Amino acid sequence: MLILTGCNIKEPRKKNNIDFKKAKTIPIEDKQLADHLFLDQIIDTQSLEIYTFKEDKDNMLGMIGKCVSTPEGILIFDSSTKAIYLFDFNGNLIRKIGSYGKGPHEYLKPLDVFYNPFNNTVEVLDMAVKTRKFDIHSGELKFEGYSFQRKYHIAFSLPLDSNLYAGYNGFSPVEEVYQNNFRFGVFKGKNIAYRNLYFDKETAVPVTSINPFYVFNNKVHFFESIFPVIYNIDADSLVPEYHLVFKTANPSFTDPDDPSLIKEVFDKKLPMLNRVNETNNFIFITYLVDEMKRFTIYNKADSKSLGTAVFNYKIKELDLELYSLFQDGTFLGSIVYPDDLMRVKEHLSKVQNLSPLQDRFNKLTVSALSNPVFIRFKTI
């Protein structure tokens, strides 16, 4: 199994280039491949970081709506209080971004919050179909305006460059019903969509993915979760492409001899797919099976699986809800809530031999009033 330890070369337009001279490999014995690998049993303990967000009266976090890693720190959207925070990687609050309310320059109900690396801004999509751009260094508002068709709510968005975006929606606040045809578009600045893709009635179903699409090599890869297909849109020409990448009967990225449970997931039409992401050489797929998070890495050169790993967080009967986060394929992180951690610690106190990850959990100081804990793996 190839484990990447922050090997990406940071160059404009080449964020996913991999420097294999700096890559780290972990040898896996053949007998270990007979079953799924447990990530916390093979990772180097030094490559795992656990951050506890320091809390005070100004930043008591509630339910995490979104968590994004940026060069400046960890961006947190609190869906309970509608607040947006920027923490450093030591868990210290740097600043709040914008403010919630009905006044000038305030956002009312954020639908999505994301970081735009092309202009170093935090961008908020509001229920009022407005977009607001805040400077990540100062938190000051840099832009406010209507960027989308007013009758459509953009529920998820990704920047393609400083003012070109891909967006997805399936709800019309004007008609107050879900549309028969979901809408996916590429748009620029204050203009309405340059290019739209409509799905016929048979495939127009709610997308269960956390991220229904991602950007790679200046193209938008759209993943539709019932009939697994990927749509490509070239961000330069805005000419849509369509090609079938995953097949329900015989997934093209799955080795026919690989007993991976991802075949089961495809047979179930991917009801709980979480993430699809891509680098120059690999495709990462994260999904749920039997309430356990799993991810599979596929080699793009021969379309064969490099193995399936299991997030070993469901410790026996404990039901932990975790949120996996991919950022450019370079790491995987999770958010764990205090009540879950306390149950884990209670269980771990009865376990004699702890895995490296379990040992780190066991040493955490946590109470019912603690902020959530962010876990970062620097191994992908």
Task: Indicate where each model-derived feature is located.
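Short coil/turn segments at the loop-to-beta-strand junctions that recur within blades
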Residues: K57, G98-H105, Y146-H153, F199-A204, ...
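Short beta-strand elements that form the blades of beta-propeller/WD-repeat-like
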Residues: E72-D78, N120-D126, S162-E176, V215-Y231, ...
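Asp-box/WD-like beta-propeller blade repeats and closely related beta-sheet repeat scaffolds
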Residues: L108-P110, L125-E175, N196-D200
